[in-house]
């Protein structure tokens, strides 16, 4: 570790002593790629505030790289899977998801479930390697952590918290069909006005759209499983030595930090232990590298367009690249395109290719006019933060849903990556750049995002510290977690009331019958 980081850690430790033991110890169960980027923002802030943060990473981790200088501590757990094998597996999953036809409901989500199970099997293997490593678990026990911070999309963090007997906090963007949020967190999503995730619907639904949304909800609630829950339940029961389920352990989460906010999400009810922290990674733009700044300034009053399909897409076909390049060549703006491939034949003089872009800094530049994006939540939040209208070209996962949200809010135009023509892309760019309503709507979302009493990052850190200070947040946990499914839906109460009504009706009917019989008998006696 460099002298710089050593000095920083010494200062942090000194601040802990001076603050009378207010510093805590945080154990982190991370997830790869953009999930890690978000959670690392929280971890860096926790370290800045004097807390000791330990990241539990498996030896094949891609982004949580313990070899990079960092104030974070890393505990590495060996696993039989190599980094190359893991990265190839993830790349194949992304490619398969991108290739699934989205216009066929059942096959689409059956493939999604299959891929989620494949990913879940890898995570379960990593989890087994951790909890079966007696030396590592003993070290974690002796470290006396105050809280576990985990991404709910990768199970195991809650199991570690249960084994270590400490509270845990979740960070989560979403799960397909809100499955984890509903079954593990008890969240409420009325289907009459809350569209199911990945449905690409908006909150203002027609009757037939509400029918469609109800079908989605029933499918995700009773058929679709994010993970192979049966195997996870058996695994957790075996490790803990008692019958339990994955969702039963997930329900013990003290706080859910959802990476969303009302500038992005449609309004819906929230539980007391749920906090929105969307855009926590966003920050003011920094100066661009000299050569890039010169290129941006050369655009004059026309400005620039920023184009990025994210870090997980690097296999664009030559045909698609040429379709895109020819459209970009026809606009008056200069274009900065993140592209890792052979230079397209139709590339215009106004377009520069880069293997990496300082995306946030470009979106915050005063000359940026539009953002062509795949619809990743991180990129969309940076565009919202800086008030930049978007052309959405979603590829997989939550991206189509994200772009549907931005389109509903009037800040984006959507295109289909596989079928769009050069003319389609050109017209979409002209629309979001020349029609002022898109810029106005983007700025409105930006204003909403900035007008919060507490910044998202500060809110996330506050609640983690709150859980450490109070050894949990049980006072925010709804009693619904302690009810059976029929108690939750008051079916036992409804059954009891129906039985009471039926009993009263039966008694009244019997009484009336007896009175009728008595009267009839008396009349017959008088005749005799």
Curated annotation (Swiss-Prot):
Stated EC number for the protein is 2.4.1.17
Q: Which InterPro entries match?
A: UDP-glycosyltransferase (IPR050271), UDP_glucos_trans (IPR002213), UDP_glycos_trans_CS (IPR035595)
Q: What is this protein called?
A: UDP-glucuronosyltransferase 2B19
Please give the PROSITE patterns that the UniProt record associates with this protein: UDPGT
Membrane disposition: Single-pass membrane protein
Positions where N6-succinyllysine occurs in the chain: 135
Q: Signal peptide position in this chain?
A: 1-21
